[in-house]
């Protein structure tokens, strides 16, 4: 059997129909000889180090993709087997290397921002698994976000634009999302949800169906205290980001985060006026909105904090990018430098944990493991709980298909990835699935429900809180 990325390419592509790809016209413009080779790239501004022109081929200011970043790919293909969409489709242009070819071709003026170009970029999850694999340090996530910014400025088709207007007008705004969730709670409790699902009334509307299938029982959450003092020896003062989805759908995660941090010796400040961190906007290329939200968040938190604690992987990853997108001198960048995932602080504490007799497995949220490089801390915390047997999840860092709002925009691809994730969970015989991101929790819980798996899907702080007791 052939080995390496090239062998994986052949194996994954083996089941596809023969004949030209639907994307062949654009692929031929990027790869005239039908192969992915660097010699097909022409000489242009992208090949001149240090050049930052006002216009770069099909791209224009502001927020041009970095020419040095585009040039840094050496076309080795190590990223290909790590890319979820490439694993599913086996298409070069739906791999990191292929997408970089498209971006670079557009930057060199050999390719315009066409619907086909946009489609390949839209199918990317932005999981950054390619960055973890890349020996050259290609900043794929930043290049993707900048390119999506270019696409957004060009405008979308009416259907996509309407869906994005709904999503971005609702999810990042807790004051709007809260009333919407209360209506959804009525939908659930009235029996209407059971009727809609039994009759499959949403089958003709895949994106709406995907949104409805994610629904969990909407909890009744209370407001967190503005300050909870440390218990015992004081270690310092932290602020808690409550998030948008987290505070409304998983309020218990925030409440237990405060309790655990307090028991670990931290004063916990939770500003009631804090808003969205902008993660969804960054991933979607809405860069001006992202910057505005970042500035507002920085103003909401006092400067006299040792750390900003985040318990949602997507939020933490986006906040750590503030310096890049707003400049290192910006107040938001100072907040980013203080940002820590909750597991990074709790792993330093010596909490008295009681036994939990269960089998658990851990899913690496993409924006925790690839976006922030946090892999060992959550596992170390779970391993400390007496009686809890931690079983490694096969392909633990393969995206579950949530990816922010990807599962709403691209439900078919998201479901294919979710099916593979649930297969792996079932293989562990675990009764607890642990993940550090609310989007992953919703997505994986949906998959386990559909499969009929008796698996409880929890955040790491929920498991630790059970072991800590009252």
Predicted stretch roles:
Residues 77-81, 91-96, 267-272:
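N-terminal glycine-rich anion-binding loops that anchor highly charged ligand groups
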Residues 66-86, 114, 118-138, 397:
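Cysteine-centered iron-sulfur cluster-binding motifs in ferredoxin-type domains/subunits
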Residues 104-119, 221-231:
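Active-site-flanking structural segment that lines cofactor/substrate pockets
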Residues 31, 140-470:
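Iron-sulfur cluster-binding electron-transfer modules in prokaryotic oxidoreductases
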Residues 50, 71, 89-90, 105-114, ...:
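Signature of N-terminal electron-transfer/Fe-S-associated modules in redox systems
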Residues 47-59, 86-116, 137-165, 453-463:
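Non-heme iron-sulfur electron-transfer modules
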């Amino acid at each position: 059997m052939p080995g390496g990325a090239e062998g994986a390419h052949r194996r994954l592509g083996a089941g596809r129909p023969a004949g030209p790809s639907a994307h062949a016209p654009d692929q031929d413009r990027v790869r005239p000889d039908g192969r992915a080779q660097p010699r097909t790239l022409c000489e242009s501004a992208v090949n001149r180090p240090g050049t930052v022109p006002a216009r770069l081929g099909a791209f224009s200011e502001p927020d041009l993709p970095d020419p040095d970043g585009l040039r840094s790919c050496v076309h080795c293909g190590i990223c290909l087997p790590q890319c979820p969409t490439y694993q599913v489709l086996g298409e070069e242009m739906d791999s990191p290397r292929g997408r970089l070819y498209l971006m670079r071709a557009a930057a060199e003026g050999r390719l315009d921002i066409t619907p086909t170009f946009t489609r390949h970029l839209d199918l990317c999850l932005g999981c950054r698994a390619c960055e973890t694999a890349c020996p050259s340090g290609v900043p794929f996530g930043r290049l993707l976000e900048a390119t999506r910014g270019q696409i957004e400025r060009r405008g979308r088709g009416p259907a996509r634009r309407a869906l994005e207007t709904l999503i971005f007008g609702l999810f990042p705004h807790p004051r709007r999302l809260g009333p919407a969730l209360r209506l959804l709670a009525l939908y659930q409790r009235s029996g209407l949800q059971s009727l809609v699902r039994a009759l499959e009334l949403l089958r003709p509307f895949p994106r709406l169906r995907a949104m409805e299938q994610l629904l969990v029982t909407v909890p009744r959450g209370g407001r967190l205290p503005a300050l909870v003092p440390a218990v015992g020896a004081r270690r310092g003062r932290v602020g808690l980001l409550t998030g948008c989805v987290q505070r409304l759908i998983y309020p218990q995660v925030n409440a237990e985060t405060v309790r655990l941090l307090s028991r670990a010796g931290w004063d916990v400040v939770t500003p009631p006026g804090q808003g969205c961190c902008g993660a969804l906007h960054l991933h979607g290329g809405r860069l001006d909105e992202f910057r505005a939200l970042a500035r507002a968040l920085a103003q909401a938190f006092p400067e006299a904090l040792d750390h900003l604690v985040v318990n949602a992987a997507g939020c933490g990853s986006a906040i750590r990018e503030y310096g890049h997108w707003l400049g290192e001198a910006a107040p938001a960048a100072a907040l980013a430098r203080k940002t820590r995932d909750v597991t990074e602080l709790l792993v330093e504490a010596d909490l008295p944990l009681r036994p939990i007799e269960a089998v658990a497995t851990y899913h690496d949220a993409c924006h925790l493991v690839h976006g922030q490089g946090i892999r060992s801390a959550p596992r170390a915390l779970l391993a400390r709980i007496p009686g809890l047997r931690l079983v490694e999840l096969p392909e633990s860092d393969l995206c579950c298909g949530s990816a922010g709002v990807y599962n709403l925009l691209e439900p078919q691809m998201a479901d294919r990835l979710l099916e593979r994730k649930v297969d792996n969970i079932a293989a562990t015989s675990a009764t607890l699935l642990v993940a550090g991101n609310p989007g992953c929790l919703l997505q994986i819980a949906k998959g386990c429900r559909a499969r009929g798996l008796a698996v409880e899907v929890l955040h790491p702080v929920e498991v630790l809180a059970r072991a800590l007791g009252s």
